[in-house]
Design a protein with these regions (language model features):
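Solvent-exposed, charged/polar functional surfaces in cytosolic regulatory/catalytic domains
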Residues: 53-56, 60, 124, 128, ...
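Acidic/histidine-rich alpha-helical segments that form the ligand environment
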Residues: 109-146, 151-168
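Short, contiguous alpha-helical
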Residues: 19-25, 32, 44-48, 55, ...
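Residues within well-ordered alpha-helical secondary structure of globular protein domains
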Residues: 60, 83-86, 120
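Surface-exposed helix-capping loop/turn segments at secondary-structure junctions
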Residues: 60-66, 128-138, 178-184
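Bacterial Sec-dependent N-terminal signal peptides
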Residues: 1-22
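Membrane-proximal N-terminal soluble sensing/regulatory segments of transmembrane proteins
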Residues: 38-39
Length: 197
């Protein structure tokens, strides 16, 4: 009996800790508007929009949702989130003018850590890019390294590449979870970046 009580207490503690982590994650809502339309701030808002969509697409997913895939040959929700993590890694590294090693070596294998790290990487990028001038942005490049070989691309590719791709795949997750019987939480408004609770 004592073991059951301890187990119950530990389980409740873990669940409460996960809820606290979730409430502290970035992009539950889009931050207040920037005070100017600096080039960096426009890029930041695009990343914030992607982060908001990802936050709510993945909020409240069950282990059954994470395994869901629309067909035998398709990717599961878990695999899609791993891909989004890789995209967030590219965005973060580019914002710091660092090399993005492909494939990323440190992809978390725990759901809470994978989601948290993805959102934190996007948040890190917004902090780096905020208020950057066009000249400062022009100095940034997407740098990939695979098998010891590097390739570079202009920052423009981050808009139609990783940022847009996160939005696209977040939409897939929303569709998959709805098909699996767990629709997006009510009140999510991607236009305002706020969620009515």
């Amino acid at each position: 009996m004592r073991t059951l009580i301890i187990l119950f207490f530990l389980t409740n503690t873990i669940v409460m800790a996960q809820e606290n982590i979730s409430s502290e994650l970035p992009f539950k809502s889009i931050p207040e508007d920037a005070t100017n339309y600096a080039a960096g701030n426009l890029l930041v808002r695009m990343i914030e929009g992607a982060g908001y969509r990802f936050y709510w697409a993945t909020e409240g997913l069950t282990s059954d949702d994470l395994k869901y895939k629309p067909s035998d040959s398709g990717q599961s929700v878990w695999e899609t989130v791993e891909h989004i993590y890789g995209l967030s890694d590219i965005i973060r590294n580019t914002s710091m003018n660092k090399v993005s090693i492909r494939p990323p070596a440190d992809t978390p294998t725990d759901w809470a850590a994978l989601r948290m790290k993805t959102l934190r990487y996007l948040e890190d990028a917004t902090k780096q890019l905020r208020n950057k001038s066009p000249e400062e942005l022009a100095a940034l490049e997407i740098i990939f390294e695979r098998g010891g070989k590097q390739s570079t691309f202009p920052l423009w590719n981050m808009i139609n590449g990783p940022i847009s791709d996160i939005m696209y795949h977040s939409g897939q997750i929303v569709s998959f979870r709805r098909t699996n019987g767990n629709p997006l939480p009510k009140g999510v408004n991607v236009f305002t970046g706020r969620t009515k609770e």
